[in-house]
Amino acid sequence: MTENKYLYVETFGCQMNVNDSEKIATLLKDEGYLPTDDPERADLVILNTCSVRAKAEQKVYGHLGRFKGVRSRKKGFLLGVGGCVAQQEGERLLQKVPWLDLVFGTHNLHLLPEIVRAAERGERRAEVGFIDNETRLDLFPETGGEGGVTRFVTVMQGCDNFCSYCIVPYVRGREISRRSSDIIDEVRKSVAEGVKEVTLLGQNVNSYGLKTEGELSFAGLIRRIAEVEGLERIRFTTSHPKDISPELIACFAEVPKLCGHIHLPAQSGSDAVLARMNRGYTRAGYLEKVEALRAARPGIQFTGDMIVGFPGETEEDFQATISLMEEVRYADLFSFIYSPRPETAAAGIRDTVSRKEKQSRLDRLQTLQQQMKRERNISFVGTRQLVLVEGVSKRGDQLYGRIDGNRIVNFAADQSLIGTMAEVTITQDYQNSLLGEIVTDKGDAR
């Protein structure tokens, strides 16, 4: 074991990147790097990047600039870039940023210790090659366990859908599913370390196992994971609406450990726009899935994604998106102005929507979503909810956790409750959380 040094990882983008950052920390621990939340203390800084939108990509270059002068005042300091921008740019990043030491793509996490050792010797390296599926299967690093009540578990990587606006297949590669036995073993190991809730991760979890002969379907995997003794809750993300199967919907009715929340990105409420996006479903088909999920799990909470200003989007198309939102009543929504990405099919479509109109549509959509989110939060006030207590809140004098429907609840209670299921009465709503009081008498919680 070498002398301890400090690692700071800054994460951009999706939950898959959050999970990858946890794996980065685990891989580098054996190289003598301990995690720190302070970049000024770090001997190695890694930016784990996102390239889904141009704005996210530009932000990376801005953050790299912050570290330009660090080496002159800190001997041995190293700077690295991983994730989707690294996969997309590769060697060009080293050429554009002379003070950058190492670059590693989405298929190269397993090489990170070797790349860091090379950087410590003064060798600048970029490793962004895709690797074959058989090799990838054997190189899925598990997320390390350092306490915590919840944990991400990767079940698959990549995407074969090629939505016309999306760069993910080009930077994450084609779909590949982990062996179900490996996933279940990782869940069992996590529970033995004190984990009570797992979130199953993939770019399109609904495709899990479909291309692997003899493997479980995603619904079958959920049912097997639910059999793990000591596990309280199961979540998953992200789902492609076209691949939501009747078997998966049945899990919401028949598997009590599966939480009553689903992230179901619609992207648009207009059939014309959905067709140009190559989403593979219609508005009516999406709503059929929503209603089937509601029938299976009354009270299920929906979150999603919406894109405004896609090339050719008319005001009528936009109003179709607004009306879809009003039908679904999302608990929360990630919404963005369309951003053309290199290599994607939509990048070649002539953009007919002005920047001013795109911003106007985004503002109107987000105003509506904030109203619906507030209404949803208010509906919880006065109810009793079961909360998986995850830890001490940012305020320090309260605990926090999540209800089945994925809303954060803060409440005053003894820290001995961390890691348990607590019954809480919701007393107040806020924009991004709920406030509650611990229940001392017996009663029915949702």
From Swiss-Prot:
[4Fe-4S] cluster 2 binds at C159, C163, C166. PROSITE patterns: MTTASE_N, MTTASE_RADICAL, RADICAL_SAM, TRAM. Gene3D superfamilies: Methylthiotransferase, N-terminal domain, tm_1862 like domain. It catalyses: N(6)-dimethylallyladenosine(37) in tRNA + (sulfur carrier)-SH + AH2 + 2 S-adenosyl-L-methionine = 2-methylsulfanyl-N(6)-dimethylallyladenosine(37) in tRNA + (sulfur carrier)-H + 5'-deoxyadenosine + L-methionine + A + S-adenosyl-L-homocysteine + 2 H(+). Residues 145-375 form the Radical SAM core domain. InterPro entries: Elp3/MiaA/NifB-like_rSAM (IPR006638), Methylthiotransferase (IPR005839), Methylthiotransferase_CS (IPR020612), Methylthiotransferase_N (IPR013848), Methylthiotransferase_N_sf (IPR038135), MiaB_methiolase (IPR006463), rSAM (IPR007197), rSAM_horseshoe (IPR023404). This is tRNA-2-methylthio-N(6)-dimethylallyladenosine synthase. It comes from Geobacter sulfurreducens (strain ATCC 51573 / DSM 12127 / PCA).
